[in-house]
Amino acid sequence: LVISASPRKGGNSDVLCDEFIKGAQQAGHKVEKIFLRNFKVNYCTGCGVCNSTHKCVQKDDMAEIMDKMVNADVIVFATPVYFYTMDAQLKTLIDRTVPRYTEMVNKEVYYILTAADTNAANLEKTVESIRGFTLDCLDGAVEKGILYGTGVWDKGEVQSSAHMKTAYEMGLHS
């Protein structure tokens, strides 16, 4: 399951998702992409109802996405990096997993990050924030790969970079 949190269709992280998918499909894997931009996922209101019911009271697309996350063997989290953290779309999705995140066990996880910054070390804060969910909250989660898509600012700029090959190969070996 590839989760593209890019707010832009054809944005850099979204383009790398497609390359990852090509590689994974070449390896014979069945892959589904969720482009969060096309789904309605409201912010968590902190009401706490889900603590006892394991269901969110909000009527949006999160239940459908959550089912896919629970059933996936592999989850790719892809986000542009804004101010050295994940974008709002991915953070909102993660916050909304509270009712069922304990059902997401033994997942293999990958991260695809894109940023204008050219120094991959500066993206570690973003990786750590995603790991706070995947490795610290999901039982048995195993981190399988990270793509630091650095040095890309303009929409689609990543297409002329070596990051494309890296994304494809990461998918191929997923």
Tell me the role of every PLM-derived stretch.
Residues 88-89, 101-146:
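Short, glycine-/small-residue-rich phosphate/pyrophosphate-handling segment
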Residues 1-78, 84-100, 142, 156-174:
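N-terminal beta1-alpha1-beta2 submodule of the flavodoxin-like/Rossmannoid cofactor-binding fold
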Residues 145-155:
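Short helix/strand-capping connector loops at secondary-structure junctions
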Residues 3-5, 36, 113-116, 149:
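Cofactor-binding loop segments of dinucleotide-utilizing enzymes, especially the Rossmann-like FAD-
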Residues 78, 107, 136, 149, ...:
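Short, highly charged low-complexity linear segments
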